């Protein structure tokens, strides 16, 4: 049976007695990796290969006789070969917890819609840390987009835990080699406290549980935290939370920490502010003590008793310890004062939760390029805010699909309430991504760029004078385009509409073409003018209609022709007037009809001629009157046919002249007169017409 204080070390793969412990130094504190430095001696192994020790599990045990006082388990992270006198070999070793491995991996990585427990579980699992426990009492909502940006897994874990008000420590089983990592967000989840009496006698045995020195101190720390943030989904939201520190009667309250951005988008920001405040004041009141007991380590609570200063006899939370053991007699031939153990520790009052101070978040150095992503077969993938998803060039985990990143806002040339510029980056396009305040969790697309596979419109440098806005038909090969060409002497504005083009002008529109204007319409054209239309042609106008033309005038149509109008109709011409039609010709009107002219008048027909009327009929003229026909002349009425004439004059004379005159009455011929002269040379020749009397060129001879 062993007696007294002693230390042993075992390493996986080596015999239990391979090393004797000369001394060790175990440094521990909340939310940090413990470090166990050992000086060892071995008579059994005068030489060891590094592969036999490094990355192996090592177990330090503190004994009091045959009773285990403390066990510590960890990974051998450093090993040194020391002096060798051919009888024994001195070694030095550093042991760290399995969590230490997380400090060797640096990564760029995206976590989406995961809470802190899920994120930490992934990190720990990938680093082989399987023995761990989350003890959470506070709400820790999922994060939409959380980026590990160039940090080691350990730095990322520590930063995230600090943001969420979580501290961690190694929980050591006293009677076995079990040991686990504990992540906790409240002091209430720590093991129940155990009493330790005050005993200033420094010569007590390790087996005597007591504290020999205990000093309580306070210092001025930040007094309040104000944290603020912004979310575009609630632009009018104040986004501010204030948190006053507790237990600060001994200091002023002017030491405010203002944090922007606060990395929150809702009411959860109040917890962030409170956790920050606890972190900034985690060392405002600290007691430091000394004991020979190895049972005091971070993650435990103790209750001090028997101290002459009564207010110190209370529960305390252990936040750090520095355990140092000496066993010089382990080296054969070396003398010493025997095995010793000292524990210097730090505690804070147990009525408050110790939390880590906020850690700096890595900042993105500048803009980055990324590629817009979406579901297979989709060309445009966005949400109701015009946000898109991208695949970052450094992302090794997410596929290039609709889940490659969070929704990312896109900067536009102009953004107003219901107005501005909008151009959604399309799947496959390369974009330039910046980060608000350099925060990798807040990407924003600031621009787009071409690359070797996504070429520009046109063919550079040949089209270098062109400024082009060209779209692409959704799931097609067409495009709409607005192009400005500034080539000297060939300046041009070009507009291309793949299908429809609509122009809406709420007031006036003016088009001024200095030279020529040509319009070609492949199918139909419709122009609707609500009020008036004025069309002015300076010289000539030619209008060609290939088939039919219909002109409808609702009321009045006035047509004024300065000189000549010619109308040519190939087949038929019809004019229909619903009411009255007046035709006024200042000088002459001529009508030429190739075949036939028909005139139908429903009721009356009046013709008034200021001077002469001439009818020339090539063959036959027929007048047919249904009832009465009256021929009236003011001075002279004449019928002529060859050498036959019938003349009526206004003085009542009737002249009948011809080579032969035949009078036949089938029943009778009647004649009455006061005087009848027959064959006595009494008859007169018919008089001339008034025009013939004036020797006009139209006078006839009979």
For each feature predicted by the language model, list its residue ranges:
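Extended, domain-scale alpha-helical bundle/helix-rich regions
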Residues: 85, 114-131, 138, 146-350
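Short alpha-helix capping/helix-loop boundary micro-motifs
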Residues: 37-48, 281-292, 414-420
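Short, well-ordered loop/turn sites that connect or cap secondary structure elements
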Residues: 52-53, 296, 312, 425
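Acidic, low-complexity/disordered segments
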Residues: 309-370, 446-452, 456-467, 684-687, ...
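Surface-exposed cap/loop segments at beta↔alpha junctions
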Residues: 48-133, 137, 142-146, 171, ...
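Polar/acidic, low-complexity leader/linker segments enriched in S/T/G and N/D
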Residues: 1-19, 209-211, 365-371
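Glycine-rich, acidic and aromatic/proline-enriched surface loops and short helix-turn segments
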Residues: 96-98, 113-135, 258-271, 375-403, ...
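Structural signature for extended repeat/solenoid scaffolds and their inter-repeat hinge/linker regions
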Residues: 175, 180-186, 365-657, 662-664
């Amino acid at each position: 049976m062993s007696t007294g204080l002693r230390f042993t070390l075992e390493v996986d793969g080596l015999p239990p007695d391979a090393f004797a412990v000369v001394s060790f130094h175990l440094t521990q504190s909340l939310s940090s990796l413990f470090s166990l430095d050992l000086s060892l001696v071995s008579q059994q192994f005068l030489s060891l290969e590094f592969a036999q020790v490094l990355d192996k599990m090592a177990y330090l045990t503190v004994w009091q006789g045959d009773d285990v006082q403390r066990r510590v388990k960890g990974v051998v992270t450093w090993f040194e070969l020391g002096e060798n006198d051919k009888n024994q070999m001195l070694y030095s070793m550093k042991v760290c917890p399995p969590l230490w491995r997380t400090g060797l991996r640096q990564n760029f990585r995206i976590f989406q819609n995961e809470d802190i427990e899920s994120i930490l579980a992934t990190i720990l699992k990938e680093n082989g840390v399987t023995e761990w426990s989350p003890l959470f009492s506070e709400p820790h909502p999922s994060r939409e987009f959380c980026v590990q940006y160039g940090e080691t897994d350990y730095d990322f874990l520590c930063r995230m835990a600090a943001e969420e008000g979580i501290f961690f420590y190694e929980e050591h089983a006293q009677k076995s080699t079990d040991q686990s990592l504990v992540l906790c967000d409240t002091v209430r989840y720590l093991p129940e406290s155990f009493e330790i009496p005050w005993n200033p006698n420094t010569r007590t045995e390790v087996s005597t549980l007591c504290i020999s020195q205990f000093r309580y101190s306070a210092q001025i720390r930040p007094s309040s935290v104000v944290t603020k943030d912004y979310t575009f989904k609630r632009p009018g939201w104040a986004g501010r939370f204030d948190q006053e520190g507790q237990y600060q009667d001994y200091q002023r309250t002017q030491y405010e920490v203002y944090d922007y951005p606060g990395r929150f988008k809702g009411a959860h920001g109040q917890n962030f502010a409170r956790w920050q405040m606890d972190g900034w004041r985690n060392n405002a009141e600290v007691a430091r003590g000394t004991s020979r007991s190895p049972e005091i380590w971070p993650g435990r609570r103790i209750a001090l008793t028997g101290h002459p200063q009564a207010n110190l006899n209370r529960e305390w939370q252990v936040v750090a310890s520095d355990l140092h053991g000496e066993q010089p007699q382990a080296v054969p031939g070396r003398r010493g004062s025997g095995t010793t153990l000292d524990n210097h520790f730090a505690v804070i009052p147990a009525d408050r939760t110790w939390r880590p101070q906020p850690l700096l978040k890595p900042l993105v150095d500048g803009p980055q390029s990324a590629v817009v992503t979406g579901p297979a077969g989709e060309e445009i993938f966005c949400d109701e805010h015009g946000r898109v998803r991208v695949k970052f060039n450094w992302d090794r985990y997410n596929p290039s699909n609709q889940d490659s990143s969070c929704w990312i806002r896109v900067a536009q040339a102009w953004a107003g309430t219901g107005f501005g510029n909008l151009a959604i980056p399309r799947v496959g396009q390369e974009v330039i991504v910046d980060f608000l305040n350099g925060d990798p969790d807040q990407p924003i697309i600031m621009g787009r760029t071409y690359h070797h596979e996504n070429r520009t419109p046109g063919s550079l440098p040949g089209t270098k004078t062109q400024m082009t806005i060209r779209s692409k038909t959704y799931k097609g090969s067409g495009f709409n385009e607005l192009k400005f060409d500034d080539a000297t002497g060939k300046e041009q504005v070009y507009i291309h509409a793949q299908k429809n083009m609509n122009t809406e002008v709420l007031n006036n529109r003016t088009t001024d073409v200095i030279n020529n204007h040509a319009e070609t319409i492949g199918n139909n054209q419709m122009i609707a003018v609500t009020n008036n239309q004025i069309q002015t042609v300076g010289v000539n106008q030619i209008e060609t209609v290939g088939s039919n033309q219909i002109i409808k005038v609702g009321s009045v149509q006035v047509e004024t022709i300065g000189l000549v109008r010619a109308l040519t109709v190939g087949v038929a011409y019809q004019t229909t007037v619903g009411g009255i039609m007046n035709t006024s010709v200042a000088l002459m009107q001529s009508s030429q009809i190739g075949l036939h002219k028909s005139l139908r008048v429903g009721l009356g027909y009046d013709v008034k001629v200021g001077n002469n009327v001439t009818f020339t009929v090539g063959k036959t003229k027929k007048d047919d009157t249904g009832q009465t026909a009256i021929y009236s002349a003011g001075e002279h009425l004449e019928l002529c046919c060859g050498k036959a004439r019938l003349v009526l004059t206004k003085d009542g004379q009737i002249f009948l002249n011809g080579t032969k005159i035949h009078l036949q009455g089938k029943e009778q011929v009647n004649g009455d007169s006061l005087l009848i002269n027959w064959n006595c040379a009494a008859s007169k020749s018919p008089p001339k017409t008034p025009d013939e009397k004036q020797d006009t060129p139209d006078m006839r001879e009979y």
